[in-house]
Amino acid sequence: MTLKNKSIVVLLSGGLDSSTVTGIAKKSEAKIFGLSFDYGQRHKKELNSASIIAKHFDIDEFKIIKLDLSLWGGSSLTDTQKNIPIEGVQTNKIPNTYVPGRNTIFISVALSYAEAIDADFIGLGVNALDYSGYPDCRPDYIKKFQELADLANKRGRENNPIKLWTPLLDLNKEEIIKLAFDNHVPLDKTWSCYSGNSKPCGKCDSCRIRNAAYEKWLNNNNKK
């Protein structure tokens, strides 16, 4: 799949994954339209990181959409009465940091935007190996949403569908960090932590997964 001279809407949260997707798209000479969401998340610092990444890669357009999912809560990311789990990553259950329907809502907005500007792709930073077990980051979810997208808009019905582009889907976090360096992502400007603090907590799932992968990448590169 070539992205050169193609238009792509990237869901840019400001985290490691979405920033890496943006970097890959930039290196591929795509026309990039970034979308970020102010959805009532406690870690609003990611919005600042998203803006910095958008400027770093000089993308064609960047929008922050106000869409307050904290109105009904259901997640420790949008409800400050719930504690963010810090006991370590658990693989046998979906953690309370899962935001009900978040990816479905965000990708739907991106699909509408992409169709309006006649973009060819929607870039997503989802990955199914090193993640917190969210149901909307898995390959079967992406496959089914693509099927929905093909049916749900004019371009799909005219056999010119907008494609979901998920270059990180089958990669682990260490591989993503390597890709980030290869594509000139300023990792120190990205934000992964779920806490609303000014510095990463180092204890939430997102911090633990990222830090462990970075340590592994560092160790492997020091051996070379």
UniProtKB/Swiss-Prot annotation:
Question: Which terms are listed as keywords in the entry?
Answer: ATP-binding, Ligase, Metal-binding, Nucleotide-binding, Queuosine biosynthesis, Zinc
Q: Which GO terms describe its biological process?
A: queuosine biosynthetic process
Its pathway?
Answer: Purine metabolism; 7-cyano-7-deazaguanine biosynthesis
Q: Which residues bind Zn(2+)?
A: C193, C201, C204, C207
Q: GO: which molecular function terms?
A: ATP binding; ligase activity, forming carbon-nitrogen bonds; zinc ion binding
**InterPro entries associated with the record:** QueC (IPR018317), Rossmann-like_a/b/a_fold (IPR014729)
CDD domains (alphabetical): QueC-like
Give the highest taxon in the source lineage.
Bacteria
* Enzyme Commission number, as recorded: 6.3.4.20
Q: What Pfam families does the entry give?
A: QueC
Cofactor(s) listed:
Zn(2+)
Class of enzymatic activity (EC top level) = ligase
Record-listed ATP binding positions: L12, S13, G14, G15, L16, D17, S18, S19, T20, V21, T22
Q: Which reaction does it catalyse?
A: 7-carboxy-7-deazaguanine + NH4(+) + ATP = 7-cyano-7-deazaguanine + ADP + phosphate + H2O + H(+)
According to the record, cofactor stoichiometry and binding are noted as: Binds 1 zinc ion per subunit.
**Which family is this sequence assigned to?**
Belongs to the QueC family.
* Role according to the record: Catalyzes the ATP-dependent conversion of 7-carboxy-7-deazaguanine (CDG) to 7-cyano-7-deazaguanine (preQ(0)).
The protein depicted here goes by the name: 7-cyano-7-deazaguanine synthase
Give the species: Prochlorococcus marinus (strain AS9601)
Q: Which gene encodes it?
A: queC
